[in-house]
Structures are given as structure tokens and as C-alpha cells.
Amino acid sequence: MNVLVIGAGGREHALAYKLNQSNLVKQVFAIPGNEAMTPIAEVHTEISESDHQAILDFAKRQNVDWVVIGPEQPLIDGLADILRANGFKVFGPNKQAAQIEGSKLFAKKIMEKYNIPTADYKEVERKKDALTYIENCELPVVVKKDGLAAGKGVIIADTIEAARSAIEIMYGDEEEGTVVFETFLEGEEFSLMTFVNGDLAVPFDCIAQDHKRAFDHDEGPNTGGMGAYCPVPHISDDVLKLTNETIAQPIAKAMLNEGYQFFGVLYIGAILTKNGPKVIEFNARFGDPEAQVLLSRMESDLMQHIIDLDEGKRTEFKWKNESIVGVMLASKGYPDAYEKGHKVSGFDLNENYFVSGLKKQGDTFVTSGGRVILAIGKGDNVQDAQRDAYEKVSQIQSDHLFYRHDIANKALQLK
């Protein structure tokens, strides 16, 4: 069959790579993709992921059987709806169901209604109310802007000055807009991907841990993710089971009960508190860079899993008996302003690297985004995989990239 992957980043590179391995898949297309994907997919960088009509025309022309949507924006913009209305199979939720990521308030309200464990919250609609609220709120406080923010719409404020600054950042010159304040939760964060079709929820039996902050020791601003690893040895199968029972199954049922037909992967960003696992966020798609490490470890056929889910079967994932560590190299300045167009070399285009922000300029690759390339390390345990990942990092040549030096350290410290 012919499969079209929507998106241009490292997550989509990993999806295309994994789908290309399937015996069920004849041809992988990518829109817009990136030029690093050309060994595994027919890449169409001339088509934008926001040009729904062009994507539909392409899918018709190429007899596409399945469309796999990687990023959140096309989902929230309703690309899945348009494709389904024209008879295409789509892995990714419709516009209504994608609100679970598109609106933090939507997610909070549904969790509150169905008693799904999460932090207490307060919503405000005006800047002046936000400034009033923080005068007496408990610190630290988590400040979230409603809507999409590419993983950067969350600020943890330890002081009242930091909270005021967060509000200024969230509102800018606007006086109105929804901001959600949350009680700060302490504990170990982890990411659980769950395949969902209506009230059928099939969680991965392998979790990943992301590293959101820009710099070592979890310092600096939030990013889209500076690295990830799997499995997470210090989070037990019992925690996974509990997360499934208290979060994954209830949210699938809640969404269906509220009239939202979710089909795709639901990313559960959770935290293991002293009172058990609680939800930090939901995403309506694979995490990035979690997808890259999880799909590298997945032994079974991703396309088969998607078909099983579509048929309402409780699909069984199989995993390689190894650890995977992914280290993200990003443009200096990210997640704030950064330069583009700098040469990057030293990497190969096989399973050792997944590309997020590079484009071809003549025969060389140059930077085109904030997060640039993820180096993948593999090993019998986290320590060996981490060593391998940083060996892969050392092979990349560029004066304009930075990376964290402590990806997966937590797993080694908590052994």
C-alpha cells in the first residue's frame, strides 16, 4: 500500500523510516518532509502541510491508501476531516477530537468532569485578572497559554516576579485571552503513547522520558524537547498499569462519551507524584523526540498496528531488547531567536540520526530550524545507549549547534 506522512520534522522522519520497513507498505511519501528523508520516502517539500487542497489532490493522484499525520497544527486545522470526507484512511484525530491538545482548558475541563487525576487549575480570561490571581496564589505556579505553542507555552514561576513576567510573555500587548494556572506537581515525568480508537485504548508497554528544558540540569526555558530515552528503568510496570487504568482508559471513554471520536495516538504527558500518576498534558499525536526513540526500539510493524487499531483489535506491540537514547542538537539561541543557514555535516542518513531542521543547499545540509538533528544511541542498557548517543553527537560537525550533556542521566542516578 501507499502511505503518505504529513510533517517535516524528526518525528516524521522516524515515522517514514518505520513505515518504510513494513512489508505492507510499498511506497512512503512525505509532505513536505525534509531532504534527509529521501533514502526512505518520496519527499515533496514543494507542498506545504497547511495546503489541505494540494495534499488531497496529491493523495488522489498517487492512490494513497493511508495518511499518517505527524504534527499537531494540521490536526487542529482539520486536515484529517477533509481527507476522511474524501474517502482516505487517516491515522490522526479529527479537528474536534484534536482539541484535547489544541486547548489546555478543554483538556482540563474534561479531566475535571471525569475525575482523571491532574493538577488543580484556575482559568482566567483577562490580563488584569491574571495579575490579580498571582498576588495570592501558591508558588511555584505553572502558567499555561491556551492553544498551541510548540511545547513552549508553559512557564513554571518560582517567584511572584517570575509569575508577572510569565503573564507579560503570555499576553504581550493583548488584554484578553485564556491563560490556565496550575498547581505545581512534584515527581518524575514520563510520556506514554496510547493508540486510541473511540473507547478502545491500547497503551505502549514501553514509556519514554523527555527532557523539556533547554540546558543541563533541567535549567533554562521550556523547549519542544532536547532529548529522550526508553525504556525508563526507574518507572515500574505497576506505574504503567496504573496510568493505563486511571488515565488512558478513562480519557478514551470520556472523549467518546462527550461525542469526540478520537482515532490516532494520544500522548499522555504524566508525572508520578506521591499520590500516583497525574496528567500534565495531552497531545493528539506522537511526541517529538519520544517518537524517534520509541519507534527505534519498536520491533513490530507500525503499519500493522495502525490497521489493527482501525479494525478495533487490541494490537500487541513488540520491542527490541535494548535501550535507546536520543540527543537533540539545536541551533544556538533556541528556543529564542536563532540564525539559520549554517552548514552541518558528519552524520549519515540511516537509523543513527533523525533530522528536524536541516535543508539541502547544493550538496550540503544547512540549518533551517531551532531543533536540528537527533542523534540515536543504542545499547544493552541505558548507560551503553547514552555512551553510543554521545559518540554519534561527537561526529556532527557544526559551530552553530548546542546540546544537553545529561540526557538519560536520571535513569543512571536512580538505578
From Swiss-Prot:
Pathway of action: Purine metabolism; IMP biosynthesis via de novo pathway; N(1)-(5-phospho-D-ribosyl)glycinamide from 5-phospho-alpha-D-ribose 1-diphosphate: step 2/2
A Gene Ontology molecular function term of the record: phosphoribosylamine-glycine ligase activity
Family indicated by similarity: Belongs to the GARS family.
Protein name: Phosphoribosylamine--glycine ligase
GO biological process entries: 'de novo' IMP biosynthetic process; purine nucleobase biosynthetic process
Binding site for ATP: 134-191
Cofactor note: Binds 1 Mg(2+) or Mn(2+) ion per subunit.
Domain of life: Bacteria
Protein's gene: purD
UniProt keywords, alphabetically: ATP-binding, Ligase, Magnesium, Manganese, Metal-binding, Nucleotide-binding, Purine biosynthesis
Residues involved in Mg(2+) binding: E281, N283
Cofactor requirement: Mg(2+); Mn(2+)
Annotated ATP-grasp domain residues: 108-311
SMART domains in the cross-refs: GARS_A, GARS_C
Catalytic reaction equation(s): 5-phospho-beta-D-ribosylamine + glycine + ATP = N(1)-(5-phospho-beta-D-ribosyl)glycinamide + ADP + phosphate + H(+)
InterPro entries assigned to the protein according to its UniProt record, in alphabetical order: ATP-grasp, ATP_grasp_subdomain_1, PreATP-grasp_dom_sf, PRibGlycinamid_synth_ATP-grasp, PRibGlycinamide_synth, PRibGlycinamide_synth_C-dom, PRibGlycinamide_synth_C_sf, PRibGlycinamide_synth_CS
Organism this protein belongs to: Staphylococcus aureus (strain MSSA476)
EC number: 6.3.4.13
